[in-house]
């Protein structure tokens, strides 16, 4: 099974560049083309928050126009830049969300279960999990204790060493989430967005993964006084590849035209020297 994770598309109003620099509309289009050209074809795509930059209806409509080009099913959960009411209204036809007070979802139609957990708090850049959301998650994990789960959330519960991002990670319900996940061994990993960088952290025996953006990336600067800056490093998506024999492997798939592929071996089967 292949799950593509896309995070932090930050779609703005038509013709608007992010930070007067980044053509996020073109970036999303290129991302969709990239996913459609993947071999083998993924089973689904999940967008892990910050779908839009300001949460307006116009931005969600523009996002939807582009992602409808996908050849595979897609799902979304919100991030801190999103507006939950507008997001739910614009995607009401998809019937993803079963709760009224948060936009969390469960996908049951595959060899492993996909759970998307809403960590957004209206008006806040940091994330949080209320007791209601945590109880909902616990209920979902109790349903099929023998079936593996890949859990998605926007805000990572860990610090990645970039100060201006770490102060706006998952701030509320973090310890309760750690305790909860520690009880359920079927959770393969917690896959996050928000930080615009690929990272891996072992947190309370739980693998926490973060994804880069298909547009711009947060600058990698681990100094305590580092400025809040972005760089135009190669855009990418995450490919979460699961097999029953081995379990979960996650790849970073870069978007763009690169040299190659070139063969390692010649026509005689000899290593090219």
From Swiss-Prot:
Q: What is this enzyme's EC?
A: 3.1.4.46
Reaction(s) this enzyme catalyzes, per UniProt: a sn-glycero-3-phosphodiester + H2O = an alcohol + sn-glycerol 3-phosphate + H(+); sn-glycero-3-phosphoethanolamine + H2O = ethanolamine + sn-glycerol 3-phosphate + H(+)
InterPro entries linked: Calcineurin-like_PHP_ApaH (IPR004843), CNP_phosphodiesterase-III (IPR050884), GpdQ/CpdA-like (IPR026575), GpdQ_beta-strand (IPR042281), GpdQ_catalytic (IPR042283), Metallo-depent_PP-like (IPR029052)
What biological processes does GO assign it? glycerol metabolic process
Binding-site list for Fe cation 1: 8, 10, 50, 196
The top EC class is: hydrolase
Keyword annotations of the record: Glycerol metabolism, Hydrolase, Iron, Metal-binding
Residues reported to bind Fe cation 2: 50, 80, 154, 194
Pfam families according to UniProt:
Metallophos
Name the Gene Ontology molecular function terms of this record: 3',5'-cyclic-AMP phosphodiesterase activity; glycerophosphodiester phosphodiesterase activity; metal ion binding
Q: Give the UniProt family note.
A: Belongs to the cyclic nucleotide phosphodiesterase class-III family.
Function, in words: Catalyzes the hydrolysis of the 3'-5' phosphodiester bond of glycerophosphodiesters such as glycerophosphorylethanolamine (GPE), a typical phospholipid metabolite.
* Protein name per its UniProtKB record: Probable glycerophosphodiester phosphodiesterase GpdQ
The taxonomy runs: Bacteria, Pseudomonadati, Campylobacterota, Epsilonproteobacteria, Campylobacterales
